[in-house]
A protein has these predicted regions:
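A donor-sugar binding/catalytic signature common to diverse glycosyltransferases
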Residues: 232-235, 239, 407-454
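Catalytic donor nucleotide-activated moiety binding site of glycosyltransferases and closely related
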Residues: 193-195, 366-405
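Glycosyltransferase-associated regions of secretory-pathway enzymes
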Residues: 2-55
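Leloir-type glycosyltransferase catalytic cores
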Residues: 277-324, 451-517
Length: 517
């Protein structure tokens, strides 16, 4: 009774002293006891619970504080270790070569083991019996995986300019020797700038240190292997461009590989890709290459087959987004569809005189051209649809007049267009195949092939767009396009040997004779 609990007190509260087991006449004493204990017990019980909660909360808080503090210290420690490891890796590239590398006739450089699309099988078949080494720019893939896929001896580059190929948010220090190398190689500084713009999570000095590391790493690799030729997949990736610079320094011939301009093919070029290719820079010579009527008819059949099967270099989404776009456009007005490209992987960034000469004469990137085109379309009350490259960000300023076509099937968009426009996107070929007029703002294999409209000066864009709307895809353009495709298939594009009903392009034996002998 000295420390009663509330539930006990409530039992006593309802009892009388006349009940069983309660005897005597001390009723007044019990009432006094109950009254004295009642309020005190409630307060005491509340205070006790509160004290317990406070005590355990304090313990939890202290534990949480110290645990967080401990975790932060551990993270800092781990970050310092990672930072030091990367610093050591970048400063001692010679330590990256565990294998004893032998001399090779050919090096194949790229990340094709990751995306493949028939590239690995083609390379494996084409290089059988040859002295070849694959330099895989896929740090996140195991060497065994790459070798099993290609059936060719391989090494994995420790770091590369792809997502998952580098370390994010790691600050590094530049050594004096690294600063000296950068000063002596302006092109390396430009590549570093591109990396900073493309990969926003690269830490302080990381891009500078990485380009110097790759430059030295590839230099050591070439000295160890002494190849006669190097095949580079997609020259415009930063890692691959550094490899090309080292090849130039070492006087080693490079052949640039990429998917062909029409689906189902590859192309190999000794001079470069897109606006840097032989076809773009020797237009008159290319246009004079002989083709006969049979080759012309074959080109038409190839185009019909591609359109019928809806073949595309990239898998297209299946959805109903095109219906939303149809609802947004004004039915009685012309529709301009503008296709962006991956500016970072198309040789456009950083924008400089080289880009002006070989890629984009007036537009600094996809969004820059979009702003110019949208203003023209708003002024003329034309529908304007923009499909940016999936890897690029949308415009910072969102104009309601710009119809967003992200995630829409490219073929459905082209069918909706009166005119297709692009700087460098291969959608230009897709549009021409489907009989749509194309306005080119930049230089590709289509440069001066007389099958597109060319707006290579900013002041001419509006006038040329208007002409394309009025004149459309003329019969002369159609004939020139068929001739262009016939020449590509005869002299430039190689069958990728992926299973399909209709085969076209040069044979794998042609590739072996022209590039491996």
């Amino acid at each position: 009774l000295w420390q009663p609990k509330a539930k006990d007190m409530n039992v006593f509260k309802n009892l009388t002293f006349k009940d069983d087991f309660i005897v005597g006449n001390n009723n007044i004493g019990y009432d006094r006891w109950f009254a004295s204990k009642k309020n005190f017990q409630k307060s005491n019980e509340y205070c006790t619970v509160r004290k317990i909660i406070k005590r355990y909360y304090k313990k939890f808080k202290n534990f949480s504080f110290f645990q967080n503090f401990k975790n932060r210290l551990e993270i800092k420690k781990q970050k310092r270790i990672i930072q030091q490891n990367i610093q050591d890796l970048f400063e001692f590239p010679s330590k990256c070569f565990d294998d004893v590398l032998e001399k090779k006739d050919f090096l194949l450089v790229g990340h094709f083991a990751y995306f493949d699309k028939g590239v690995c099988r083609y390379i494996s078949n084409a290089t059988q019996g040859k002295s070849v080494l694959v330099v895989s720019t896929t740090p996140w893939l195991k060497k065994e995986f790459v070798q099993n896929k290609l059936k060719i001896p391989s090494i994995i580059v420790p770091k590369a300019t792809f997502n998952r190929g580098y370390d994010g948010n790691v600050d590094l220090n530049l050594t004096e020797s690294e600063k000296y190398i950068l000063e002596r190689n302006p092109r390396l500084k430009e590549i570093s700038l591109r990396m900073k713009l493309q990969y926003k999570d690269m830490g302080k000095n990381y891009p500078d240190k990485m380009v110097v590391f790759l430059f030295q790493y590839f230099d050591i690799l070439l000295k160890k292997t002494s190849p006669k030729k190097v095949f580079i997949w997609n020259k415009f990736n930063a890692t691959h461009e550094i490899f090309y610079l080292v090849c130039l320094k070492s006087n080693i011939q490079c052949i640039f590989m990429e998917f062909g301009v029409i689906p189902g093919t590859f192309n190999f070029d000794l001079q470069g890709q897109m606006g840097e290719s032989w076809i773009a820079n020797h237009t008159s010579d290319f246009n004079k290459l002989e083709i006969d009527l049979g080759e012309l008819e074959n080109a038409k059949k190839v185009l019909e087959y591609i359109c019928k099967e809806k073949l595309c270099r990239n898998l297209q989404p299946r959805n109903n987004l095109i219906d939303d776009i149809k609802r947004k456009i004004k039915k009685d007005r012309p529709t301009i569809v503008y296709f962006g490209q991956n500016d970072f992987e198309a040789g456009m960034i950083p924008y400089n005189q080289h880009v002006v000469k070989y890629h984009s004469p007036w537009s600094i990137d996809s969004n820059d051209a979009c702003r110019v085109l949208s203003e023209i379309c708003i002024k003329n009350d034309w529908n304007f649809i923009y499909k940016p490259h999936p890897n690029l960000e949308w415009l910072e300023e969102k104009k309601s007049e710009i119809i967003d076509a992200r995630g829409v099937d490219i073929h459905e968009l082209i069918d909706l267009a009166d005119v297709a426009v692009t700087i460098l996107s291969q959608s230009s070929y897709e549009a021409l195949m489907r009989g749509k007029p194309v306005v080119m703002l930049g230089y590709t294999h289509l440069k001066h092939k007389n099958c597109t409209y060319e707006a290579f000066a900013k002041d001419d864009v509006e006038q040329i767009l208007d002409k394309a709307i009025k004149d459309g895809f003329t019969e002369e353009m159609r004939k020139n396009f068929h001739s262009h495709i016939a020449r590509l298939l005869k002299y430039y594009l190689y069958d990728d040997y992926v299973a399909r009903k209709f085969k076209y392009g040069k044979k794998i034996e042609d590739f072996q004779n022209e590039f491996l002998n």
